[in-house]
């Protein structure tokens, strides 16, 4: 079941996500559909894990590990990686949801089956997402049923069969208090994650369909971003989560959005379109900083996710497969640059204090006598007192 030295690739990419590892290392887990010829299955679906090289902004040429799904499971359709980086959940077309553990080191790893989930017999789950603190898992079904589970004890918090017509997208807030969900019929609802209580249904115009949702993650004033289609115009609505009222909107992409993501530090918002474009905007100004036109030429972008530690996007489509794109945005400060700046500020402060001390008439500097002139300040050695200065001070140098 596990192949540690790579495997032959099968069908197209259907889902995927980044895996955060220690020391800012990152892996990518990808689900691939079975390869078929007519009604015959030539090779079953697989789950693969690749390493990421930040120097070349590319994935490894062969997977670190591969898990082959049973033919009865069908194809993988959604994945969610726990924030701890050791577990992930995968939903399949026929076998429900399965829990996997990533075992091993940085070069030789295994994907191991874990204990059965309560979601194994609930049918295909279009959306899977862990809360930011890893304490909850939400699953949104093609049938419109919403489930929220505690993690890791898997206690069922909510099972709402009629949450939506069919769940399209979902996201937890940064504090893991709220869950936002969208439907294929254009509606969007807000749920309290602790007990599953429905809090609000987002207001929308008569010609407006809410497609996607993401909470802000910068830790300041929290917002909810929703990609919506207003007639023929795609917009991003912004909602205040204290009132759940819309406070503004912005057009950030030319065609209808198919997927949406917010960077881990909350600085950037990305949209992938149904014709293969990618737009990245700064959240603070809502201005576009990066635009990749026809990144997946003529194909709807199915997967869009920011790398946890780099300004890099992972995208995929049915025809063009997975792509890793480095963003053309302003560079972030590196750790060594911050330390160098702090050291420079400290040295400037020390020099300023020294100059102030040498030129001050304070308790720590003996008061100037009558007719006494202030000594010259030397930065590179002790200056010798003049004869006039010695005569004006009969006590000589004073030591405290």
For the regions a language model picked out, list residue spans one by one.
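Loop/turn segments within WD40 beta-propeller blades
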Residues: 18-25, 80-85, 128-135, 170-177, ...
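Hydrophobic beta-strand positions that form the internal "hydrophobic ladder"
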Residues: 28, 88, 137, 179, ...
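WD40/WD-repeat beta-propeller blade N-cap
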Residues: 7-12, 67-75, 116-124, 161-167, ...
